[in-house]
Amino acid sequence: MPTTVTLAPKTTIRTYSFDPGKTGKSVLCLEVGQDRFQLLVRDTGGQASCLEDYRFSSLSTDQSLLGVLPDVFRNHEILLAGPWQEIRIGINSASFTLIPEPLFRKEYAASYLALMRGSLLPPHEFAQVYAHKADGFLSVFNLEHPLFNYFSEMYPLQPLVFVHQTSALIQATADLDRRSLTAGSIYLYFEDEFVTVLYWKGHQLRYCNRFGYKNVQDLAYYILYVLDEQSLAAGAVPISLFGEITPFSEAYSELSRFLPSLSFGTVPAGLTLAPEFSDLPDHRYLSLYGLGLLNE
């Protein structure tokens, strides 16, 4: 018996300022994961005016998000609008690596990923590259051919930019770091049983990695390991929390035992949110906001 998948978004923010007939100077930001899909619209004034968050937790292991997306797109006022100034698609996957620009060779992109994964990419995937020009490195990540083809068909002759989720987080935390009064800062982004750790020092990205964990004890161990690896005392730098974490979560309770400088993060100042976003926790959608800040 086929699994029934709920197509209604768990979170929806719409503003009266969004006009689907005037998208030529607006940016459509989409984030795609194994069982989730999110969208954000940055309008002509640089303001985030729409947000939707879909979660397809009932997808079985042999089902793919691509099988659900056509139903989400069908008759969707925003997704079927256009043409857009740009469409930015964040890929939320476990396979990525950052390569310093002087060492990067395009013909070795798949090899970089194979070295990181410990195995070759499967036939239905390829290595995609995004350049962080201001920071002097490139992000290499896996992208599925069917997913790439689907978005290319949905938005023909429109500028598509594919990035890894970590690239959006790098962009968002770079914006936060530029306005920070401290010499260094650590940013933690939580999602399901993963945490992405970013460490900025002297306005340079010194560390970026993603860890999977099964319990909060493992989570605390990984964070303390990173601090030790970077020669940082537990209270030496402020640590900002983003994503799926709350003051009442088990993860927060465990981390607060060891880390005295925890705080919940804020929206990057480079992106303005419409008043309708006021009910959302500021720290919740950092990767989506980072897509809105790309190239800023």
Summary of predicted features, one role per range:
Residues 238-258:
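Glycine-rich phosphate-binding loops at beta-strand->alpha-helix junctions
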Residues 2-8, 36-37, 129-232:
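Small-residue (GG/TT-enriched) beta-loop-alpha framework at ligand/catalytic clefts
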Residues 263-296:
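Glycine-rich phosphate-binding/hydrolytic loop that grips phosphoryl groups
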Residues 6-8, 49-59, 68-174, 270-272:
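Active-site neighborhood for divalent-cation/phosphate handling
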Residues 50-79, 217-231, 237-240:
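N-terminal phosphate-binding loop and adjacent alpha-helix
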Residues 34-64, 202-217:
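Short glycine-rich, Thr/Ser-proximal phosphate-binding strand/loop in the N-terminal lobe
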Residues 2-46:
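N-terminal basic/disordered segments at the start of proteins
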